[in-house]
Amino acid sequence: MNIEIYTDGACSKNPGPGGWAYIMVNKDSKEEICRENGGEKSTTNNRMELMAVIRALKKIKEGAASLADKSGKALDYKSISVHTDSQYVQQGISSWIFNWKKNNWKTASKQPVKNQDLWQELDSLSASIKPEWIWVKGHAGNPLNEACDRLAVEACQKMM
């Protein structure tokens, strides 16, 4: 089975109340496997974007046995793709992170990397799961991206 994960984050006032969400689907059958959302009282949009991906990959890492399709068969995946509308997440994990690690978690301008705690957690999860990272244009009619956006906004509103 091939898994697609759609993620999104939302924040009001940045920093302010925020929400994250993910939807996991079987790419082959298009069947939804699971969805989850949550939030924080004081955060940023970038932290929520990162948290969405981290929570989804943690769900995978918890064990495929905890994820089953509707037939009850445990999840046995061949590949995972993460779809995000956040250039920050997609570029960060696919490109920038290599220099950040090489430079002791400093940016090219020698400043500490923002959200280092989450980037380190995502780096560890990504190294073991090895997902493909795909950027999708937000608010462009992709049904799963739009659904994820609604879930993240809903979680954000609950934090207000």
Swiss-Prot record:
**Per the annotation, how and in what number is the cofactor bound?**
Binds 1 Mg(2+) ion per subunit. May bind a second metal ion at a regulatory site, or after substrate binding.
Spell out the subunit comment. Monomer.
UniProt keyword annotations, A-Z = Cytoplasm, Endonuclease, Hydrolase, Magnesium, Metal-binding, Nuclease
Q: What is this protein called?
A: Ribonuclease H
UniProt gene name: rnhA
Function of the protein: Endonuclease that specifically degrades the RNA of RNA-DNA hybrids.
Residues that, per the record, bind Mg(2+) 1: D8, E49, D85
Name of the top EC class for this enzyme = hydrolase
> In terms of domain of life, where is this protein from?
Bacteria
HAMAP family registered for this protein in UniProt? RNase_H
Which residues bind Mg(2+) 2 per the record?
A: D8, D149
> Which GO cellular component does the record give, naming just one?
cytoplasm
- Tell me its cofactors: Mg(2+)
Q: What is its main location?
A: cytoplasm
Any keyword RNA-binding?
Answer: no
* Compartment(s) where it occurs, according to its Swiss-Prot or TrEMBL record: Cytoplasm
Alphabetical list of InterPro entries matching this protein: RNase_H, RNaseH-like_sf, RNaseH_domain, RNaseH_sf, RNaseHI
